[in-house]
């Protein structure tokens, strides 16, 4: 099986190399790994103890981030070595100030794993949520380097628990401890004789509470909002935008305004959104006191401000639920916003709980969206939804401290 796995890894790398000739993201993936070991070696100039964090992309980074910053604050002698698998993580966070070194993870081969660990020499290793790389985990286990999986979620239908999944299940035993988000994940692992597990929760909750505490203010949004209510489309794709824009057409009064923060902020996508709108709109980058106040829709054409924008909102429509899975719902509910999203939310613990408690609503189409919006116009219905949304965050804080104390204080 290991030969088949290694061949699959090689084939994946070769496929990305071919794709790099015509795909920008694949090109970044390939170029970021050129001469990577010499680049890493040139940066490591001392023997200061190192903690290695590995994240697939930006979402996983946000889950690891609270723990990184806790270690930096309480254990400043440790250096943080941060790796990403995807360009969508590294390219956005390559200047992250709490990491001493930031690189792409070299392809998961036995040779690469040995060379990487020989150069980096981590004392402690954290893999975040869904990252399972056999050769790295096996080498870490053989070298007896403490390795932890944090903010993970497990389901019965995952390959680890299939009759043919023994090779992948073996990776779970390479971790010294697994911190899961919920009791269900723990029970699945225990049923499969993986006993080195505990429920810590989702570290992202601690992160969004920190964002709420230190939220940024934007004069442009204040001018834009005035005395209206704002419906925010967060990390939207065309499917959500079509629903939102259709609803905008029905709002002829001055009660509502709208913020659209698309997942893709390329010029092509921004123009596409503007073309669909038949109302006065303004991009954030071009906003001023005059045109903000006059606009019905503001389009966010940058990355990084959405998490603070939710403070101005009343309701949030979250993108991704009609595609591969919803984007961040924790950021809006921290500010007490009820959230609406598409059908594909089941892999996200917080979304499941929000639907159960009435703080979040899943929709299949425009008619269902319209029904939820009409329901939320009722003050009692809205206040109940807002309270339930905010309760989830307050109830589930503290995962970062649980993990930190377990590893560094032996609690």
Task: Give the residues covered by each predicted segment.
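Low-complexity, intrinsically disordered, cysteine-poor segments enriched in small/polar
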Residues: 3-17, 21
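Active-site and donor-binding regions of nucleotide-sugar-utilizing enzymes
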Residues: 17-214, 232, 236-238, 251, ...
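Conserved catalytic-core segment of nucleotide-activated headgroup transferases in glycan assembly
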Residues: 60-74, 213-287
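Nucleotide-activated donor-binding/catalytic signature segment of Leloir-type glycosyltransferases, i.e.
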Residues: 93, 97-102, 271-300
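Hydrophobic beta-strand scaffold residues
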Residues: 145-147, 258, 281, 339
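Catalytic binding pocket for nucleotide-activated donors in carbohydrate/polymer assembly enzymes
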Residues: 175, 191, 306-391
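Donor nucleotide-activated moiety binding/catalytic core segment of transferases
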Residues: 204, 282-324, 329
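C-terminal alpha-helical cap of glycosyltransferases
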Residues: 396-411
């Amino acid at each position: 099986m290991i030969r088949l796995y290694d061949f699959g890894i090689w084939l994946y790398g070769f496929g990305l190399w071919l794709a790099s000739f015509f795909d920008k993201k694949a090109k970044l993936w390939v170029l970021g790994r050129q001469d990577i070991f010499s680049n890493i070696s040139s940066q490591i100039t001392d023997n200061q103890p190192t903690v290695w964090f590995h994240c697939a992309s930006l979402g996983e980074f946000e889950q690891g981030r609270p723990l990184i910053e806790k270690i930096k604050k309480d254990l400043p002698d440790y250096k943080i070595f941060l790796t990403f698998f995807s360009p969508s993580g590294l390219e956005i966070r390559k200047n992250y100030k709490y990491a001493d070194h930031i690189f792409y993870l070299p392809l998961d081969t036995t040779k690469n794993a040995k060379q990487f660990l020989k150069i980096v020499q981590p004392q402690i290793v954290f893999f975040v949520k869904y990252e399972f790389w056999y050769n790295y985990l096996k080498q870490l286990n053989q070298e007896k380097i403490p390795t932890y999986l944090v903010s993970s979620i497990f389901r019965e239908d995952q390959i680890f628990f299939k009759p043919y999944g023994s090779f992948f299940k073996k990776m779970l035993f390479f971790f010294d401890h697994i911190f899961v988000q919920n009791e269900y994940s723990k029970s699945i692992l225990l049923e499969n004789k993986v006993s080195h597990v505990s429920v810590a929760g989702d570290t992202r909750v601690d992160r969004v509470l920190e964002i709420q505490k230190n939220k940024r203010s934007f004069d442009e949004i204040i001018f834009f909002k005035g005395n209206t209510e704002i419906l925010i489309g967060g990390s939207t794709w065309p499917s959500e935008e079509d629903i939102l824009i259709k609803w905008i057409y029905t709002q002829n009064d001055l009660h509502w305004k709208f913020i659209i923060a698309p997942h893709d902020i390329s010029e092509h996508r921004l123009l596409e959104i503007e073309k669909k709108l038949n109302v006065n709109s303004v991009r954030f980058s071009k906003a001023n006191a005059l045109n903000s106040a006059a606009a019905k829709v503001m389009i966010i054409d940058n990355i990084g401000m959405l998490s603070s924008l939710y403070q101005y909102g009343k309701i949030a429509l979250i993108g991704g639920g009609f595609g591969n899975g919803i984007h961040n719902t924790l950021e809006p509910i921290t500010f007490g916003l009820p959230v609406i999203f598409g059908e594909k939310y089941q892999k996200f613990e917080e979304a499941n709980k929000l639907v159960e408690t009435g703080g979040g609503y899943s929709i299949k189409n425009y008619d269902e969206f319209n029904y939820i919006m009409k329901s939320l116009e009722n003050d009692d219905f809205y206040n109940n939804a807002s309270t339930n949304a905010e309760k989830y965050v307050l109830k589930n804080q503290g995962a970062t401290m649980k993990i930190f104390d377990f590893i560094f204080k032996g609690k």
